[in-house]
Amino acid sequence: MHHPVILLLCLSSLAGAANLPPEDLSQPVTADVIVPTGGTAILKCTVQEHLESSLQWSNTAQQTLYFGEKRALRDNRIQLVHSSPNELTISISNVVLSDEGEYTCSIFTMPVRTAKAVVTVLGVPQKPQVSGFESAFKENDKAKLRCTTSGSKPAANIKWYKGPEELEGAKTSVLEDGNGKTFTVKSFIEFDVTKDDDGAEITCAVGHESLHDSAKSSSHKIQVQYKPTAKIESRPSMPREGDKLRLQCDAYGNPVPDNYVWERENGEVPLLANIEGNSLVFFNLNKTDSGTYTCKASNTLGTFITHYKLDVNDPSPIPSTSSIDHAVIGGVVAVIAFLLFCLLIVLGRYLIRHKGTYLTHEAKGSDDAPDADTAIINAEGGQGGSDDKKEYFI
């Protein structure tokens, strides 16, 4: 039922399309350009049908820059990139803010056809300058810092960081520069400082579209002065009577603590103890040195007091000389006994192997000496002699 309506709409659309003017193939085509100061702008103009005419580029003051491949304006920053009947491309190097505006590409047909290309020049912000670090902060002070950058177009944005952490709450002001084109941006930040901020890096980062996702920044490390803290360490940790002991007071602060005072609760510091810088030294500990000792560490901002309870233990037991001597003697006796035992074994084996072949001086001196000599001769003569052999023993 709706088919006639749909058909009518389709016919109407076709009729409207038929009434559109045909595409002008001789119309030049250009594109807008955005370039930062100091950069290079590329101006490209193309045409499908040149109709035997040349393309021409003109600047914002309608001065001809190039007509075809012929240079018309003496400006070495402007160079020919490509020239053909269907294209004319030129470049402008070291772009400045005054180069901004509308550039015209023309083709001298009948009628003359033109196309505009808008060149936008970005003002690159300068490296930011940060103030407020002229002197050190004191703990719990409020830091007030300012960051300034000039020459940006459009106006730059500024962010603050403490280490990797972004600081919130900054206030920003934007002022137009004297040239009427660029801007100066100022950012102010305030925050309370603690001793943990001593040495922290504060960064002012400037962001701008001319910086291509990077940022110009300035960083400074802040100094925070604070009262000292301290603790006492014992060396050795388990002191005994007769030891040398060093009680060392390790203090931290800004400025560095430079004054140390040692005291003893309910008494005087022993006369034989020496104060060496931040240390109290006992050269020969005594039981009477036990007690609570106090170290007062000071800098220009204040004093910190820390305590240490000293308990002197009994001297280490020393083994007696007599017990050492007994052990040595016992060891020597054991060695000698072992050697004698070995000697007896060797001697016994020797006697067994030479049984019946011994002749003593006493035997030689007796009445049976000739028989003893004969026994020796028979023994040396082997088994070939008589079976009757005499043996002489002591």
UniProtKB/Swiss-Prot annotation:
Keyword annotations for this protein, in alphabetical order, are: Cell adhesion, Cell junction, Cell membrane, Disulfide bond, Immunoglobulin domain, Membrane, Repeat, Signal, Transmembrane, Transmembrane helix
Domain Ig-like C2-type span(s) in chain numbering: 128-223, 228-306
A cellular-component GO term for this protein: anchoring junction
Q: Which domain of life is it from?
A: Eukaryota
Q: Identify the Gene3D superfamilies for this entry.
A: Immunoglobulins (2.60.40.10)
Q: Which SUPFAM superfamilies match?
A: Immunoglobulin
Q: Does the keyword Membrane apply?
A: yes
Q: Which residues lie on this side of the membrane: Extracellular?
A: 18-326
Q: Where is the composition biased (Basic and acidic residues)?
A: 230-240
Q: List every stretch annotated Disordered.
A: 217-240, 363-394
Q: In its keyword annotation, does this UniProt entry include Membrane? A: yes
Q: Name one GO biological process term.
A: homophilic cell adhesion via plasma membrane adhesion molecules
**InterPro entries assigned to the protein according to its UniProt record, in alphabetical order:** CD80_C2-set, Ig-like_dom, Ig-like_dom_sf, Ig-like_fold, Ig_sub, Ig_sub2, Ig_V-set, Neurexin-like
State its location(s). Cell membrane; Cell junction
**Coiled-coil boundaries:** none
Please explain the role this protein plays, according to its UniProt record: May be involved in cell-cell adhesion.
Q: Can you name this protein?
A: Cell adhesion molecule 3
Q: Which organism is it from?
A: Xenopus laevis
Query: Which gene is this protein's source?
Result: cadm3
